[in-house]
Amino acid sequence: MSLNFLEFEKPIAELEAKIEALRDISRRGGDNALDLDKEIKQLEDKCLDLKKKTFSDLGAWEVAQLARHPERPYVLDYIELMFTEFDELAGDRAFADDKALVGGMARLDGRPVMIIGHQKGRGTKEKVRRNFGMPKPEGYRKAKRLMQMAERFKMPIITFIDTAGAYPGVGAEERGQSEAIATNLKIMSELSVPVICNVVGEGGSGGALAIGVGDYVNMLQYSTYSVISPEGCASILWRDSDKAPQAAEAMGLVAPRLKELELIDTIIDEPLGGAHRNHKATAENIKQRLIEQLNELEGFDEEALLERRYQRLMNYGYC
């Protein structure tokens, strides 16, 4: 069970703490233990009802907080839970290996695929090493190299998007951050193999879009996808980042709204309480959807696949 609770989850946290305390009393009592099963069951039922009520009516700001939860699964977690025979590939063959973006070959249900995804890292040292999941140009050029390799070997491409955005540092801009992102957009629109993109946490601006052009774009239930963070939007519009909750509601960054606008194709359910509550169940939900979509896309020849992707992209912005 997660030890990190968000502000709106505090009533749930208090109930779970009471349940754990009663269980502890029952365990330590030995032969003289009090029979607390009835009380524990009542609290468990109450906690379940509270979770259902809380998560059935989340606002955009609450979803944005869930998308950033520190215990949410990242691409390396999904690789371990969903794929076999993963072989990581490093470097852009020009400048460096960007640890904020992970990629390599693997098998999904026996089928060879290329995986590319943002990795935020856990713990201070790992977060710094991964640059908090914000790739530099060399990261996106690594992604380009792997996508072109996948095309040569006729391997479907699966991406996992979870970034606050592309790294905005001076060095990154000097090395051509915008060019690297733009090049990926062009290449992904022309790839002759199936491409499935999955927003599994934060989908932040061009940093997300640089590995987000595909035949299918899926979003986890409590992920976000937007041109800017709610805090950034609030700072620009109202000069006050404390108005981020209002900005989040106005931006339409949640999966149902994006599905309504046909900017994404599928919303993948998360376990009650969010993906961080059950990594395995979340991975299984994604895996099943990927298998279904790959089975469909592999029925298209190259010309039909590219035409389908072209029509999908041309529909953007149509209301």
UniProtKB/Swiss-Prot annotation:
It is found in: Cytoplasm. Acetyl-CoA carboxylase is a heterohexamer composed of biotin carboxyl carrier protein (AccB), biotin carboxylase (AccC) and two subunits each of ACCase subunit alpha (AccA) and ACCase subunit beta (AccD). It catalyses: N(6)-carboxybiotinyl-L-lysyl-[protein] + acetyl-CoA = N(6)-biotinyl-L-lysyl-[protein] + malonyl-CoA. Its EC number is 2.1.3.15. GO terms for cellular component: acetyl-CoA carboxylase complex. InterPro entries: Acetyl_CoA_COase_a_su, ClpP/crotonase-like_dom_sf, COA_CT_C. This is Acetyl-coenzyme A carboxylase carboxyl transferase subunit alpha. The keyword ATP-binding applies. Belongs to the AccA family. Gene3D superfamilies: 2-enoyl-CoA Hydratase, Chain A, domain 1. GO terms for biological process: fatty acid biosynthetic process; malonyl-CoA biosynthetic process. Keywords: ATP-binding, Cytoplasm, Fatty acid biosynthesis, Fatty acid metabolism, Lipid biosynthesis, Lipid metabolism, Nucleotide-binding, Transferase. One of its GO terms (molecular function) is acetyl-CoA carboxylase activity. It holds the Pfam family ACCA. The gene is accA. Component of the acetyl coenzyme A carboxylase (ACC) complex. First, biotin carboxylase catalyzes the carboxylation of biotin on its carrier protein (BCCP) and then the CO(2) group is transferred by the carboxyltransferase to acetyl-CoA to form malonyl-CoA. Pathway: Lipid metabolism; malonyl-CoA biosynthesis; malonyl-CoA from acetyl-CoA: step 1/1. The lineage of its organism: Bacteria, Pseudomonadati, Pseudomonadota, Gammaproteobacteria, Vibrionales. Residues 35-296 form the CoA carboxyltransferase C-terminal domain. PANTHER family: ACETYL-COENZYME A CARBOXYLASE CARBOXYL TRANSFERASE SUBUNIT ALPHA, ACETYL-COENZYME A CARBOXYLASE CARBOXYL TRANSFERASE SUBUNIT ALPHA, CHLOROPLASTIC. Transmembrane segments: none annotated. NCBIfam families: accA, AccA_sub, PRK05724.1.
